[in-house]
């Protein structure tokens, strides 16, 4: 709600100010890549504008940053007719094509040389944006060049598209042309998220951009990392400028991104050199390109040259070498990454793709392999983009050899191919993982770096380059070998002298003394971060309660350890021996995390490395067992969730009061929740609590519970 003292006029002024500030910050972040404020500061401005608009809904303007995303899905896309046709460009594939293009223009004009602009041809989706008096009123896809689809609601969600133009000097009606793309790094993150969620990845950034732009629900488009780069306008002469270069300068001044690298080029030789540079720099560009575009820069000269039936005479698209090629799958093999993820890889008959020889391609995971049904001997389409491992995008079924058999991951990969440890697929994950994280050679460097990290054992001076050498020379095979390193071994490494070796040995010696929480975190158990490791250490004596205190022999047996083990910490033994059901009862440990912990310690190789670490002198003060109090609080061990807005205390204060009485506060409602404390605007957690039959109390009810527990 707006401040009660704010008048309508004050609110209107503040809303206009906030719209301007937020739009300015969007421009710096999404167009210039130069953020001017922190995310928290931006969010505060955005929330303030939302509150004011909620208080004065009749003052909400269509160009407000809060109005980018429509709240409902569309039933379909209306047809939209372009003010000026969006014609194709003639294509060139050979150097002679470019020479002929330049010669035809010079002959037609009767001049010795022509000035062109050179720009990358982005591999995305072409759009036409129409602005009326500076405000975005329509966005359409290219379609057949004359008629496209109205995607205005979706395009409004793109932060690189100004809802209102910046500056001044624009005509009353302006049609802007551009290309919507997904940058390479955003595409990799998007596909990884889809794979992690068990969804089919996009074949390439162009397909991802096209699919994202044509969503019927703009809220889905808003979650996709789309960016617009502009390359011109429908009617450049309406801007009152003389060159294409000046058109692009106008667009940049009005708040748009333009493509880069953009160059002025005089003559065909300069164009050829620009094309060659683009080929060399292609992998370093943040977006995919499929060519270079050359346009006559002088707008008056363009008018003289005119158009053919399908394309302008003054522009040419020079295609770059293809990113895809056809080859044969010689074998499918599992590959173990640094985090233990096991990925099926296709070994290919070597094939050249855009100037690079490709001999392998990722098949992502078991589900994706089964969906694509790639088989050994198949002919496949392979795509390469930048430094990313090439991807198989399609199988040519017509060329499948007779007798080719499906490659079933679970049948072929029953143990880690690197170390023989068990393979685990945790519910909700798409990936299979080797559970021998402390033992597996493929994971060794990553395991050591995590073990030595600041929040783990904090071994100062043990960086990536040193770890690479230690592993390559065979000096560290398991983590305990770190504590057996000598001065001569360390001093002989690159970038290490006598003093550095002494410092690292001292850091290793200090690291022997730690805490159980840090030690558990340092082991790199999947899904176990600092908070979960601390919860495990604190709750250790509440695990394996059927085993009496002090009975380490029974705990060793339950944990799969023999009597000679160097592990003497009862708290650690209880964690190692605990079944998933016990672990799941710990705060912040759900079923997925519980199974990951139990699976980690069930792997004999991991237990062996933990044993070796304790034998090497890694130790910690034993956590104090919980005292058996004469009178136990009625809230001891009870699980609470606090949601909504409380009137007489903050949620942090409520949490502190509950924990002081022995209760615990979690962030989500489950069948293990005893009480939901519901304040105002409780929302979905209240609904879930009711569905599960969890007892719901208001703030007054919480105070009664606390009073009854002696608070």
Curated annotation (Swiss-Prot):
SUPFAM superfamilies tied to this protein: BRCT domain, DNA ligase/mRNA capping enzyme, catalytic domain, Nucleic acid-binding proteins, RuvA domain 2-like
SMART domains documented for this protein: BRCT, HhH1, LIGANc
Catalytic residues identified in the record: 121
Keywords: DNA damage, DNA repair, DNA replication, Ligase, Magnesium, Manganese, Metal-binding, NAD, Zinc
Gene3D superfamilies, A to Z: 5' to 3' exonuclease, C-terminal subdomain, 6.20.10.30, BRCT domain, DNA ligase/mRNA capping enzyme, Helix hairpin bin, Nucleic acid-binding proteins
Pfam families hit by this protein: BRCT, DNA_ligase_aden, DNA_ligase_OB, DNA_ligase_ZBD, HHH_2, HHH_5, Nlig-Ia
Sequence positions that bind Zn(2+): 416, 419, 434, 440
Residue ranges annotated for the BRCT domain, each copy included: 630-711
Residue numbers binding NAD(+): 39-43, 88-89, 119, 142, 179, 295, 319
InterPro entries: BRCT_dom (IPR001357), BRCT_dom_sf (IPR036420), DisA/LigA_HHH (IPR041663), DNA_ligase (IPR001679), DNA_ligase_AS (IPR018239), DNA_ligase_CS (IPR033136), DNAligase_adenylation (IPR013839), DNAligase_N (IPR013840)
Biological-process GO terms, alphabetical: DNA repair; DNA replication
Function: DNA ligase that catalyzes the formation of phosphodiester linkages between 5'-phosphoryl and 3'-hydroxyl groups in double-stranded DNA using NAD as a coenzyme and as the energy source for the reaction. It is essential for DNA replication and repair of damaged DNA.
Family: Belongs to the NAD-dependent DNA ligase family. LigA subfamily.
Name of the protein in question: DNA ligase
Protein source organism: Halorhodospira halophila (strain DSM 244 / SL1)
Gene: ligA
């Amino acid at each position: 709600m707006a401040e009660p003292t704010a008048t309508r006029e004050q609110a209107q002024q503040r809303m206009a100010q906030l719209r301007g500030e937020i739009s300015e910050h969007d421009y710096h972040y999404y167009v210039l890549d130069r953020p001017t404020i922190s995310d928290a500061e931006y969010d505060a401005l955005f929330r303030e504008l939302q509150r004011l608009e909620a208080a004065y809904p009749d003052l909400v303007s269509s160009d407000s940053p809060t109005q980018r995303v429509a709240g409902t899905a569309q039933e379909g896309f209306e047809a939209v007719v372009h003010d000026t046709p969006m014609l194709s460009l003639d294509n060139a594939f050979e150097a002679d094509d470019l020479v002929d293009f330049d010669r035809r223009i010079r002959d037609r004009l009767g001049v010795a040389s022509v000035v062109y602009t050179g720009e990358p041809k982005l591999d995305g989706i072409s759009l036409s944006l129409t602005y009326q008096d500076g405000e975005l009123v329509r966005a359409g896809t290219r379609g057949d060049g004359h008629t496209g689809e109205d995607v205005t609601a979706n395009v409004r969600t793109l932060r690189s598209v100004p809802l209102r133009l910046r500056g001044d000097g624009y005509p009353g009606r302006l049609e802007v042309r551009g290309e919507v793309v997904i940058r390479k790094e955003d595409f990799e993150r998007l596909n990884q998220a889809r794979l992690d969620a068990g969804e089919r990845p996009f074949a390439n950034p162009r397909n991802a951009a096209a699919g994202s732009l044509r969503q019927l629900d703009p809220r889905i488009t808003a979650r996709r990392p789309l960016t617009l780069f502009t390359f011109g306008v429908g009617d450049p002469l309406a801007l009152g400028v003389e060159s294409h270069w000046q058109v692009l300068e106008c667009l940049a001044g009005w708040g748009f991104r333009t493509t880069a690298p953009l160059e002025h080029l005089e003559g065909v030789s300069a164009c050829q050199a620009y094309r060659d540079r683009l080929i060399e720099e292609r992998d370093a560009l943040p977006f995919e390109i499929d060519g270079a575009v050359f346009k006559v820069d002088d707008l008056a000269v363009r008018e003289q040259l005119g158009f053919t039936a399908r394309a302008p005479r003054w522009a040419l698209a020079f295609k770059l070498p293809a990113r895809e090629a056809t080859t044969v799958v010689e074998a499918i093999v599992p590959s173990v990454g640094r985090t233990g993820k096991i990925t099926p890889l296709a070994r290919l008959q070597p094939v050249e793709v855009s100037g690079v020889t490709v001999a392998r391609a990722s098949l992502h995971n078991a589900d994706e392999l089964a969906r694509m049904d790639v088989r050994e001997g198949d002919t496949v389409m392979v795509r390469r983009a930048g430094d990313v491992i090439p991807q198989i995008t399609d199988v040519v079924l017509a060329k499948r050899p007779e007798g080719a058999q499906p490659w079933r991951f679970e049948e072929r990969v029953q143990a880690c191919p690197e170390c023989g440890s068990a393979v685990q697929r945790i519910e909700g994950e798409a990936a299979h993982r080797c559970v021998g994280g402390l033992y597996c050679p493929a994971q060794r460097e990553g395991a050591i770096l995590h073990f030595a990290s600041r929040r783990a054992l904090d071994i100062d001076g043990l960086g990536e380059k040193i770890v690479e050498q230690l592993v390559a020379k065979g000096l560290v095979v398991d983590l305990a070998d770190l504590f057996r390193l000598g001065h001569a071994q360390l001093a002989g490494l690159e970038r290490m002298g006598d003093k550095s070796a002494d410092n690292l040995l001292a850091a290793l010696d200090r690291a022997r003394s730690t805490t159980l929480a840090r030690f558990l975190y340092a082991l790199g158990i999947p899904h176990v971060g600092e908070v979960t490791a601390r919860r495990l250490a604190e709750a250790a004596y509440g695990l394996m309660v059927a085993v009496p205190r002090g009975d380490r022999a029974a705990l060793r047996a339950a944990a799969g350890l023999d009597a000679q083990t160097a592990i003497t910490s009862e708290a650690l033994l209880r964690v190692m021996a605990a079944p998933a059901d016990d672990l799941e009862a710990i705060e912040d440990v759900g079923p997925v995390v519980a199974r990951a912990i139990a699976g980690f310690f069930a792997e004999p190789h991991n237990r062996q490395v933990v044993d070796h670490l304790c034998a090497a002198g890694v130790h910690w003060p034993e956590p104090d067992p919980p005292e058996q109090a004469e009178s136990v609080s009625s809230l001891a061990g009870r699980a609470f969730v606090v949601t909504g807005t409380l009137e007489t205390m903050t949620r942090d204060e409520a949490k502190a009061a509950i924990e002081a009485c022995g209760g615990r506060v979690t962030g989500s409602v489950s069948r293990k929740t005893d009480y939901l404390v519901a304040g105002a605007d409780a929302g979905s957690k209240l609904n879930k609590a009711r569905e599960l039959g969890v007892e719901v109390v208001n703030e007054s009810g919480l105070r009664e519970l606390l009073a009854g527990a002696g608070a």
